[in-house]
């Protein structure tokens, strides 16, 4: 018996009319031989599991794979012109900004520079503050050497030439001479014109020639004992002057204690104790510093009289809070009864 799957394959195969008419007599034999030759029971039982390797024929040869690989894929070949166009279309990204490395600088030296970098982005490449040697500091106060006259003349002529070359293309108006200001008309590359007014006389005073500062002079050494004596004398003079200007007044209170005793006979005995002078505190200090010192003294005395404060645990705090809450509820509940008792 022929399997049903083989019959479907034979029925689906296309047949030309010429070949079918010529081989009409040999059709049964050819069909039987074709069916028998194409039918292989072992081929139906084989099953290839999915893998990344390409399929290979049953006999183990790799001719089909070699032939398949040798055939060029249609539509994959591209001309070099297309590749060039694609490369040209890709946008060219500008190089990213880079900062010089600071690995050679210690972290302690970069602390101040990092603080300034928080407010403004800067590239730190050296220590801050920069170390200055004594020689470079002394060069600031050294007088410059005299230059030759030829060098001075060449420098001045070059400066005049640099100033006259851009001013030659500028146009000056005659109306500005009366006002004392000079008008310069500038023409920008884009074709627009703008006028600039400035006064040479007022600007000349802002640009002064450089003059080196005088060299520093050492401070004269003074004896400490003499300085202390002068300071104490000045303080004594100030105290005496203030005492003369504002007379100092003090108020004292005298408290007399009288003790009265009674004997068994009914006689009274009176004894007076000697008074004690007590300065009156009613006089308020006049200056702000005196009042501030008095308040500080009173604060310290009150703080010492309060005693020591002891901390309690969280459990006791919660317990006290619950007691207060219960007491409030009790008072709220017995409010009417208490009011009635007060009325009676």
UniProtKB/Swiss-Prot annotation:
Its main location: mitochondrion. It is found in: Mitochondrion. Residues 325-338 have a biased composition (Basic residues). Residues 1-27, 43-101, 325-344 are annotated as: Disordered. Keywords: Mitochondrion. Residues 51-74 have a biased composition (Low complexity). GO terms for biological process: positive regulation of proteolysis. The keyword Mitochondrion applies. Pfam families: COX24_C. GO terms for cellular component: mitochondrion. Belongs to the mitochondrion-specific ribosomal protein mS38 family. Component of the mitochondrial ribosome (mitoribosome), a dedicated translation machinery responsible for the synthesis of mitochondrial genome-encoded proteins, including at least some of the essential transmembrane subunits of the mitochondrial respiratory chain. The mitoribosomes are attached to the mitochondrial inner membrane and translation products are cotranslationally integrated into the membrane. Component of the mitochondrial small ribosomal subunit (mt-SSU). Mature N.crassa 74S mitochondrial ribosomes consist of a small (37S) and a large (54S) subunit. The 37S small subunit contains a 16S ribosomal RNA (16S mt-rRNA) and 32 different proteins. The 54S large subunit contains a 23S rRNA (23S mt-rRNA) and 42 different proteins. This is Small ribosomal subunit protein mS38. It comes from Neurospora crassa (strain ATCC 24698 / 74-OR23-1A / CBS 708.71 / DSM 1257 / FGSC 987). The gene is cox24.
């Amino acid at each position: 018996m022929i399997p049903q799957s083989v019959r479907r394959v034979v029925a689906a195969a296309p047949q030309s009319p010429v070949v079918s008419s010529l081989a009409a007599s040999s059709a049964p034999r050819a069909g039987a031989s074709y069916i028998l030759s194409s039918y292989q029971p072992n081929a139906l039982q084989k099953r290839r599991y999915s893998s990344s390797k390409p399929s290979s024929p049953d006999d183990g040869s790799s001719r089909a794979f070699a032939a398949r690989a040798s055939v060029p894929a249609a539509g994959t070949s591209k001309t070099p012109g297309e590749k060039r166009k694609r490369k040209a279309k890709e946008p060219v990204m500008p190089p990213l900004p880079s900062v010089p490395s600071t690995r050679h600088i210690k972290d302690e030296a970069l602390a101040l520079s990092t603080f300034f970098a928080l407010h403004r982005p800067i590239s730190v490449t050296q220590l801050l503050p920069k170390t200055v040697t004594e020689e470079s500091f002394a060069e600031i106060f050294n007088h410059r050497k005299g230059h030759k006259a030829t060098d001075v003349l060449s420098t001045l002529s070059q400066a005049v030439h640099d100033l006259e070359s851009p001013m030659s293309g500028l146009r000056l108006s005659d109306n500005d001479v009366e006002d004392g200001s000079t008008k310069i008309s500038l023409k920008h590359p884009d074709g627009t014109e703008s006028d600039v007014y400035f006064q040479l006389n007022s600007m000349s005073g802002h640009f002064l020639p450089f003059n080196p500062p005088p060299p520093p002079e050492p401070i004269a050494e003074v004896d400490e004992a003499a300085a202390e004596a002068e300071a104490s004398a000045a303080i004594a003079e100030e105290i005496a002057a203030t005492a003369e200007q504002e007379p100092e007044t003090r108020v004292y209170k005298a408290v007399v204690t009288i003790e009265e005793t009674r004997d068994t006979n009914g006689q009274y005995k009176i004894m007076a104790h000697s008074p004690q002078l007590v300065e009156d505190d009613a006089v308020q200090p006049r200056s702000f510093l005196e009042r501030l010192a008095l308040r500080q003294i009173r604060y310290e005395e009150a703080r010492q009289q309060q005693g020591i404060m002891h901390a309690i645990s969280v459990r006791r705090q919660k317990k006290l809070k619950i007691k207060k809450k219960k007491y409030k509820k009790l008072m709220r509940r017995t409010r009417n009864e208490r009011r009635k008792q007060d009325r009676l």
